[in-house]
């Protein structure tokens, strides 16, 4: 049987930045091939394992890739550290141990590529297209780091570009023009003053946020700019559709918009509903439950009618940071909680 903590240590030594997951996928496939209970299928750098069983059909999903960063791996007492320790090689290792346990449920496990980059390359989406029936399951758990709590649903996310107009002039005579950067400052202030909605959904509280994440404006060092572009990211609760979120954003920005300004929604995806139905045993085993702040592939699964939660080892606040560390006890605890639920 695979032991998750030892496997996580090995996985941390295998670089797997997005689009470079072949080595880690090969490694996991080789480790699982000796288990006679598993039926394995490979598509590109994505791996699917199936275990027949009874009761509701469950899917566990975890991505193999990491963001770019330093490959230093370290171990300090009761923690493992390194790029991807939290996001999400600890969760990937936990899945591997669960796959070798004696379980009662009908189980599908998916290790997939390219989660950290553009959605068009996401391995889970590519698998769903290449393997009809893969998502014919009743429940799903995405093993994103959750600090050992079950996180229900996920937020939707919307990115909008706001273009503000000004009037160009020489910087020695700024009163002859209208500075689009000054207008942008007013818009950013408006963005920062949004009162976030905090709806209670499925018994947990979601907190929305709106942030300015990028700004551009330049003509020349001696020119008052006549345009400025600001990109905003709105993380909205899953009770709103992307269309409703876009309408709310536009309504909030309206007081600082003028004729000739434009707001373009460049990307918007729905969140996943917060539901505990079917996951009560997992919540009991984990010991705590809360809302998922952020978007995960639970949202993608929800669009296919699959209720999904997030549950994995590691503090999500450490993801993508140079200080990624995960407690060995948290990895083992994740395995035991999943195994307890799936054995029932």
Model-predicted segments: where are they?
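Acidic/His- and Gly-rich active-site-bordering loop/insert found
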Residues: 1-85
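Acidic/histidine-rich catalytic neighborhood of metal-dependent amide-processing enzymes
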Residues: 93-159, 202
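Metal-dependent amide/peptide-bond hydrolase catalytic core
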Residues: 145-146, 152-153, 159-344
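Active-site metal-coordination/substrate-binding segment of hydrolases
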Residues: 57-111, 119, 123
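Hydrophobic anchor at the start of a short beta-strand
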Residues: 39-40, 47, 58, 107, ...
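Acidic-glycine-rich active-site phosphate/pyrophosphate-binding loop
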Residues: 64-76, 137, 152-163, 309
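Fold-independent oxyanion-binding glycine-rich loops
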Residues: 43-45, 62-64, 113-114, 139, ...
């Amino acid at each position: 049987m695979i032991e998750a903590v030892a496997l996580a240590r090995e996985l941390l030594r295998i670089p797997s930045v997005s689009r470079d997951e072949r080595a880690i996928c090969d490694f996991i496939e080789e480790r699982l091939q000796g288990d006679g209970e598993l039926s394995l299928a490979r598509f590109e750098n994505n791996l699917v394992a199936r275990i027949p069983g009874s009761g509701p059909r469950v899917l566990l999903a975890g991505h193999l890739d990491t963001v770019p960063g330093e490959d230093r791996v370290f171990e300090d007492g009761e923690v493992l550290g390194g790029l991807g320790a939290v996001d999400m090689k600890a969760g990937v290792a936990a899945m591997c141990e669960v796959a070798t346990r004696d379980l009662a449920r009908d189980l599908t496990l998916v290790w997939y590529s390219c989660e950290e980059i553009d959605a068009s390359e996401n391995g889970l989406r590519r698998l769903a297209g290449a393997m009809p029936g893969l998502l014919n399951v009743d429940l799903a758990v995405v093993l994103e780091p959750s600090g050992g709590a079950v996180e229900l649903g996920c937020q939707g996310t919307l990115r909008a570009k706001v273009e503000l107009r000004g009037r160009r002039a020489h910087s020695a005579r700024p009163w002859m023009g209208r500075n689009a950067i000054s207008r942008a400052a007013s818009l950013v202030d408006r963005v920062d003053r949004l009162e976030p909605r905090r709806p209670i959904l499925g018994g947990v509280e979601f907190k929305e946020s709106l942030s300015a994440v990028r700004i551009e404006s330049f003509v020349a060092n001696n020119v008052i700019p006549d345009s400025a572009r600001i990109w905003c990211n709105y993380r909205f609760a899953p009770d709103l559709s992307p269309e409703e979120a876009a309408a709310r954003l536009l309504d909030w920005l309206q007081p600082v918009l003028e004729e000739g300004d434009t707001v373009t929604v460049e990307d918007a995806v729905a969140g996943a509903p917060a539901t505990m139905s079917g996951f009560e045993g997992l919540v009991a085993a984990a010991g705590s439950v809360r809302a998922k702040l952020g978007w995960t592939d639970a949202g993608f699964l929800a669009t296919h009618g699959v209720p999904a939660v997030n549950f994995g080892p590691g503090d999500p606040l450490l993801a993508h940071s140079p200080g990624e560390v995960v407690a060995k006890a948290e990895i083992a605890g994740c395995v035991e909680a999943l195994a307890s639920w799936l054995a029932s």
